[in-house]
Amino acid sequence: MSSISTGRTALRSARRVVVKIGTNALTNATGRFNRQHFDALGQDLLWAAQGRELVVVSSGAIALGVERLGLPSRPRDIPGKQACAAVGQSRLVQAYEEAFAAHGKAVAQVLLTHEDVQERRRYLNVKHTLERLLTAGVVPVINENDTVSVDELKFGDNDTLAGLVAGVVDADALVLLSDVEGLYTGDPRRDAGAELLATVMQVTPEVLALATGTSSGVGTGGMSTKVRAAARASDSGIHCVITSGAVPGRLRAVLEGADVGTHFEPTGSRRSARAAWIAHALRARGTLTVDAGAREAIVTGKRSLLPSGVRGVEGDFGRGDPVDLVDAEGAVFARGLAAYDANELRRIAGHRTADIEAVLGYRYLDEAVHRDDLAVL
């Protein structure tokens, strides 16, 4: 039996859990839906739902659509993938309904695109809906809306989606189930000497390098997307474990604190809902290069970014759009909402606050990015 490490004991008391199930955890070697395997996963999920609030982020719609349409392989073109997703999504949700209904649990289908969390009002609508479902004892089954999302079909976005959802619902734990045991020092399919990393204290560039290039042929995600999702969760104070969904009882072992898979320790504290939205739900539309003094004031002093600290502006963005803040070396250290558009910031960059009106002829705010609209990464 697996032992229990000190760092994982918090998983035993996790009350709100997000579980992401990858395509490869639902299909066999030929890419077909594996009913026996799904039933075993269903038992794990039912156990997890007892005494906990459970959210399931599930891949598999495209693979099920391929099977239902009798296609020899997964389409490579976007319309083909979207058609398969449209056919397969109903079958996927039906499978979850049958698994949970036998034990009196209701499920709710929730289809999301990145745009649903990009805009603040829609983000809050998603959050409030999921909160209401969980309060009612319903298990939300969430999937990327592949039928209408073009960009999201290009890579393993359900890993990213699961990380975002974990932040939206303020989860205690995120479990990413795949067809591999966790993060290895090499690709275990090619390197017999690759060793499993039991614990990752912080996702560094070296850790991300280990994840690069590990993927499979049925789903769209690889280890890189999983590690990045784990990093987002960890940064928000959420425990994350990447492990195999192909092993019966593995989810239960994770939530009992056993040493299985790769555990990503939380590195940050719980963010406010607004800070979490800025940090993880938004996609930057531009970049502001800041000087060392401004970086120190933001990171250590929790201060706003003033125009005087801006050294460069890249991109074409409007007021209120998300922008990344980078240091002189180009490293992103914060994300925020711009108080001025790109052209305005180019004109006032390096100027004192008192000079803004003289340069522009008007002044909206004293800051380039207000501290209430900033999230340090």
Swiss-Prot record:
GO biological process: L-proline biosynthetic process
HAMAP family per the UniProt record, alphabetical: ProB
Record organism: Myxococcus xanthus (strain DK1622)
PUA domain segment(s): 285-363
Family annotation (SMART domains): PUA (SM00359)
Stored PANTHER family: GLUTAMATE 5-KINASE (PTHR43654), ISOPENTENYL PHOSPHATE KINASE (PTHR43654:SF1)
Pathway(s): Amino-acid biosynthesis; L-proline biosynthesis; L-glutamate 5-semialdehyde from L-glutamate: step 1/2
Organism phylogeny: Bacteria, Pseudomonadati, Myxococcota, Myxococcia, Myxococcales
Role: Catalyzes the transfer of a phosphate group to glutamate to form L-glutamate 5-phosphate.
A cellular component annotation (GO) from this entry: cytosol
Family in the record: Belongs to the glutamate 5-kinase family.
EC number: 2.7.2.11
Gene: proB
Name of the featured protein: Glutamate 5-kinase
Superkingdom of this protein's organism: Bacteria
InterPro entries: AceGlu_kinase-like_sf (IPR036393), Asp/Glu/Uridylate_kinase (IPR001048), G5K_ProB (IPR041739), Glu/AcGlu_kinase (IPR001057), Glu_5kinase (IPR011529), Glu_5kinase/COase_Synthase (IPR005715), Glutamate_5-kinase_CS (IPR019797), PUA (IPR002478)
Localization per Swiss-Prot or TrEMBL: Cytoplasm
